[in-house]
A protein has these predicted regions:
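Structured-RNA-binding interfaces characteristic of tRNA pseudouridine synthases
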Residues: 1-194
Length: 197
């Protein structure tokens, strides 16, 4: 991608980054971590400044530093948080197009909140992953889901130790189905999860 190409050009060697998370089309990442090996003598803390001079305006590096050789961003003890912002009104707002999903049917945030209790915890999320998911296990732990409305914006924030391909997008879609009255909170969520015994 753009980051690998820019790093390779900057450092004069082929660079392949490993990121903590993937980002789908239309997704903005804040606080994503990436690591790469290099033979450069450039101090780690200076790389972010040089990168930001070359990267497109919609990509910014907040910090760069040297890490231990065994550091891997996907496997460090941390949680990931995804946030979906839904513009919930009759007509779209052009200035929100890049940062929200437009949905014109009225959403009942209280019902959406009620449905989250069935999704929090350790579950088999097999029915919450996209067809491309090729993993050893579909068991994941969701540590928190918050849903709130601020004016016309409904926000769904999902936190967990790791997610399957498209899992958060499917969780958000399920909560939207509950919020528009298509399903009661308990039915739609229980259909999709099976509690580990």
């Amino acid at each position: 991608g753009v980051l690998n190409d820019t790093l390779s050009e900057l450092l004069g060697e082929k660079i392949e980054t490993i990121g903590a998370s993937r980002t789908d089309a239309g997704v903005h990442a804040m606080g994503n971590v990436a690591v790469f090996d290099t033979n450069t003598r450039t101090p780690g803390e200076k790389i972010s400044y040089a990168l930001n001079q070359r990267l497109p305006e919609d990509i910014r590096i907040q910090l760069s530093e040297e890490v231990e050789p065994d550091f891997h961003p996907r496997y460090c003890d941390s949680e990931k948080t995804y946030e979906y912002r839904i513009l919930n009104r009759k007509f779209p707002v052009p200035t929100e197009r890049l940062y929200t999903y437009f949905y014109h049917y009225k959403l009942d945030v209280d019902k959406m909140k009620a449905a989250t209790s069935y999704l929090i915890g350790q579950h088999d999320f097999a029915s919450f992953c996209g067809a491309k998911a090729q993993v050893k296990t579909t068991i994941r732990t969701v540590t928190g889901i918050d849903v709130w409305r601020d004016g016309d914006i409904v926000t769904i924030r999902v936190t967990g130790t790791g997610f399957l391909y498209n899992m958060v997008r499917i969780i958000s879609g399920t909560l939207i189905e509950v919020g528009n009255g298509q399903y009661p909170p308990e039915r739609r969520s229980e259909e999709h999860t099976s509690e580990l015994q």
